[in-house]
Every structure is written in C-alpha cells, then in structure tokens.
Amino acid sequence: MSVKAGRTKRAAQIAGLILIGGPLVFLLSAWIGSSIPRNSDWQETADGVEIFVGTNGIHTEIVMPIATDVIDWRGRFPIGDITAAQRPYTHVAVSWGEKEFFLQTPTWGDLSPGVALNAVTGGSGVLHIAWYVRPAPSDDFRPLRITRDQYASLAAQITAQLAPEDTGQSYPGYSRNDVFYDAVGTYHLGNTCNQWTSDRLAAAGIKTGLWTPLPGGVMKWVNALPHAAALPRAPHAPDAPDR
C-alpha cells in the first residue's frame, strides 16, 4: 500500500469515528446534562394553577389555561389568528422552534437538507401556538400544579419571547387550531425547542434539567411528580397538530 493510500484510509477511518462518535457524545451529554437539576428543592403545590407539559416525541410544549386572574392569553395571541376560532377552547399550548424548519416542514417528507442544516447551525425562532379543548392527561401530556406567583413568572417569560410588534408577524399553522408568531432567540444544538421549554420552567422556579436538548430530558422531571407518574397513556392525543 502506498503512503498516499495509507493516509486516505486513515482519513476515512477518522471520518467514520467522527460520524459514529459525534452522535454518541451528543446523546451522552444530553443524558448527563438533563439529569442535573435546576431548582432542586422545588415541590409541586397542592393548589395554584394547573398547567401541562406535553410532547409528541420530538417537541415539547407548555399548555396553560386560556384565562386566569394572572393572564388572559387571548390578549397576547388573538384567537382570530386561527381558522377555527369559534370552538370552545380551554387551553393554549406554547412551544418554540427554528423558523424555517417549522414553517417549511409541515410533515417530515417536506424536510430538505438545507432547512435541516440551517436549523442545526442556527436560525431565527418562532412561537407555535395551538388551542385545545379540555385536554386529557396522559403519559405524553402531564399535569403540573404550580403556585400563582410561579405561573405569573412563567407567563412573563413566555410573553417576553414574542418579537417586537413592529417587526414580528404571524404565519398560518398546520391545522385549523394553530398559528406561528415571530419570536426572539436563535435555534442551534445548544438551544433547541426542548431546551426552550425547560428554560421557561426553570426561570419560573420549577424543577427541571440543566441541558435538555431532547424531549425525554424535559419530560422525566414532570414524570417524577407523584400525581403525574401514575397516569396512563391516553388513547389519543389532544386536539392539536401532529407536530
């Protein structure tokens, strides 16, 4: 074997190790990071405001009652921005993600390499808002009861994510009950949609993981709560888009 051929072979071996080792390092780091708690002394309250943390296995979302004495979300997210505005909605779901990925990939079949690369390397954010009617608790849709002050802090955190009115706009959702709004923040591997969820919870004083790029890193902290751990998996998801 020539020197050149040997170098080529070694380069290919190194590239293969990187391709295999990179994802493994990421997954291990995500597991470790999500196992480190923030607000470790926090406990669920017996009263207060009940919210939900939901997942479809890829994304997570924070689901809240439409109106309380703390906030009426219709003042932040006009219900007239969705097609099926006349339905008797009771809850609003909020999640965050990379703008082009969300808007250009209503299904995984629509995903292009360019959109995927842009999402991984850094892209602007959008809020995904979905409206639900009496969502049922399930293994993928877990209730969490927090104090009024914690809810007020959470609401302020979410409101602050909207882009300024003079620069932001709305975009049609995937279904009749959802919509997108321009948001602040940049998406990258260190700041994913699931990290956004845990950061909002942590900022409100709620226990969650330190680095949670994957949905399991968010959900395992809710699952540890006594009144959510025993919930059965629902036979169907809430009335919401698939993503």
Task: Say what each PLM segment does.
Residues G54, A119, R142-I146, Q150, ...:
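Extracytoplasmic/periplasmic, Sec-exported soluble proteins
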Residues W73-R76, T83-R87, V115-N118, R148-Y151, ...:
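Short, surface-exposed linear patches
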Residues M1-G16, R38-D47, T68-A85:
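N-terminal short leaders/motifs
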Residues F26-F52, I58:
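Core subunits and conserved enzymes of cellular information-processing
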Residues L111-Y181:
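Non-cytosolic head/periplasmic domains of membrane-anchored proteins
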Residues G33-S35, W42-A46, W73-P78, T107-L111, ...:
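Short amphipathic alpha-helical surface micro-motifs
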Residues V53-P143:
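Glycine-rich catalytic cores of cysteine/serine-nucleophile enzymes that process amide/ester linkages
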Residues S2-W31, A160-R243:
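Activation targets extended, charge/polar-rich intrinsically disordered C-terminal tails
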